[in-house]
Amino acid sequence: MYLQGFGNYHHSEAVKGALPPNQNSPQHCSLGLYAEQLSGTAFTRPRHNNLRSWLYRILPTVTQGTYYPYEFNIMQPFVDELSPNAMRWSPLYNSSQIKCDFVEGLFHIAGSPLVNTYTYYCNHSMSDKYFANNDGELLFVPYAGEIHLHTEFGKLMLSSGSIAVIPRGVKFKVEVISKEAKGYLCENSGNPLTLPQLGPIGANGLANPRHFQYPVAAFENSGSEHTIICKNQKKLWFTVCNHSPLNVVAWHGNYAPYCYDLSLFNTINTVSFDHPDPSIFTVLTSESEIPGVSNLDFVIFPPRWMVAEHTFRPPYFHRNYMNELMGLVYGEYDAKKEGFIPGGISIHNCMTPHGPDYESYEIAASQDLKPNYINSLAFMFETKDYWQVTEQAYRHPSRQMDYLNCWQGFKIEFSQ
């Protein structure tokens, strides 16, 4: 069961009477609870993008204890001098017999001043272990397996083809439902993700607000030992407390985790000719200080009909002002016939040329242009700042050193 609607002011209580009926902070909360506000923006942000929630807890967060350095380097150093070459990786993970939870399975791929991208692998649930990110919100894009995200606000269920966002500072743990789970993770330290403006598209289309789902209140009331791991200023810290941090019995507000089924994305595409720009596939965006230039765009290339007439239908050859990190959830990407599979990654930074490989080009340039259904789901994390690649990703054996060869079949066909 979920609450529906992106950015709505929701309220939920796991025990009847836990929510104060007429105010936020009564002198004495009912059921012996404590009132605590969680702010996602400054108090004085305009009303339409002011984010906060009130939580009614068994114990306030100040009782969590003292944090100490945690011996795990989640942030990895970047390559000092990064070439303008296109880069691509095969999936980093194979199945492991070693127990590995969500935090232990994080692999830092690349970053920019306000955005970082990781992959995750886990085959073991976080039973009495919790995670929070003070540096930014987390966008989950799974490509294999199923997980449940148990958060301070309630539970989200997540599998391939769906996404979830955990806001900055919200504590959660990952329960692995399948044998193992794999996915992509994007950390956004800029403005919180929101729905893009639709412009001439109109009032409806792309990701509709009604399809975003928020958790109903659920709580843990355990007196055993619990470990909280917190990412703060690019480092991990831990504390051990004698209660679960997921002790919120009721809440109300508009700052909360949410999930979304990508199959509900209302895809906009041409019904005449040419390939529209990929901005029409934007699901969520983090606005920067420059209008129309995003700190982060989350873009998908979902299952869709291709019907353009007298047109080269795959994505065109391109050199871009923005910086692209791509992944594949399932299927075969229509611009890459080989080498780009679920779990893979490609990075094309500002002005780095990219486009269909030679085999894809040959097929698309000569095919009979009947309506064609593309049954795949690729995505892109697009930023205004260069993706700096970590040393561990740059030197990882899954990096395809021969990636540029996919364009070497092109030959001069110009004639006067």
From Swiss-Prot:
EC number: 1.13.11.5
Cofactor(s) named in the record: Fe cation
Active-site residues from the entry: H275
InterPro entries documented for this protein: HgmA_C, HgmA_N, Homogentis_dOase, Homogentis_dOase_bac, RmlC-like_jellyroll, RmlC_Cupin_sf
Alphabetized UniProt keyword annotations: Dioxygenase, Iron, Metal-binding, Oxidoreductase, Phenylalanine catabolism, Tyrosine catabolism
Protein family: Belongs to the homogentisate dioxygenase family.
Assembly, per entry: Hexamer; dimer of trimers.
Descriptive protein name: Homogentisate 1,2-dioxygenase
Organism annotation: Legionella pneumophila subsp. pneumophila (strain Philadelphia 1 / ATCC 33152 / DSM 7513)
